[in-house]
């Protein structure tokens, strides 16, 4: 058995800064990489703080705390447990000719009251219905635009809430995701997508640290 075959599903730590562990999982057979991001945010123990982190309101927070990374987050359709979202990403790495990106995906929320957890399942709209994606792109004026899609192949975000005391709750995140970028990235940028995701949540975590 080759080294690649033996280690193809072994997580590799990419970045541990800020007590946030970003790991890469490579599949050498399909030449793909997915990521896991694990971290905890401690917040004042109020229903509003916990609700913002465990509901679709988290996207408002991510947009507000990531002006350098996110141009805009648009919620196209939303019910209590499902939303369709478009994230327009700021034009990063344009110096090497990469077009500005967007992600268009469906997010489904599942609440488990028994273990006080919430799980979000994310999937690119293109993988759900190609025509639906085209309809949304027309609505967003992204047809034939300067933006290119990042394909959100899959995402699973598990959030567990623990009441540490009367004053503080720990909100534990475990995020698995695979987002496909078609560009041929230089070696030093091969984990661009994973590090971009981490930076977004790093800024979110720092917001709550600063506010406490």
What do the predicted segments below correspond to?
Residues 2-212:
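Eukaryotic helix-grip
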